[in-house]
Amino acid sequence: MANVQYYGTGRRKSSVARVRLVAGEGNILVNGRALENYFNYETLIRDVKQPLVLTGNENKYDVIVKVEGGGFTGQAGAIRHGISRALLKADLDLRPALKKEGFLTRDARMKERKKYGLKAARRAPQFSKR
């Protein structure tokens, strides 16, 4: 049982997280650093831990993550998605709880591209009547 590992890939915005769950005491490593050292915001740390807390597995697995691309918010969302998928592989009975909270759904929202003639995606240049 000690060598059993569960893998999950999570994506959010332009971030991709490859997550590995190993039986352990609840340590979370992100790109070789502790979760608290990687993310400076308590909200992001809470987001990452949500699937583990929801299923009651926060002290049952060690989580090893490699994440790349995007910013901190996208990376946190990708890690949460990856952890949820890995937990599902570990125990299929967790599916209803994870699905209800929306942790298994890939958030498809992406940054809208800038259009020519505009200053940003939708922001138009200032209009002058005269």
Curated annotation (Swiss-Prot):
Domain of life: Bacteria
One of the record's GO molecular function terms: RNA binding
Protein's UniProt keywords contain Ribosomal protein: yes
Pfam families: Ribosomal_S9
Keywords: Ribonucleoprotein, Ribosomal protein
Any Gene Ontology biological process: translation
GO CC terms: cytosolic small ribosomal subunit
InterPro entries assigned to the protein according to its UniProt record, in alphabetical order: Ribosomal_Su5_D2-typ_SF (IPR020568), Ribosomal_uS9 (IPR000754), Ribosomal_uS9_bac/plastid (IPR023035), Ribosomal_uS9_CS (IPR020574), Ribsml_uS5_D2-typ_fold_subgr (IPR014721)
Keyword Ribosomal protein: yes
Family stated for the protein in its record: Belongs to the universal ribosomal protein uS9 family.
Name used for this protein in its record: Small ribosomal subunit protein uS9
Organism of derivation: Clostridioides difficile (strain 630)
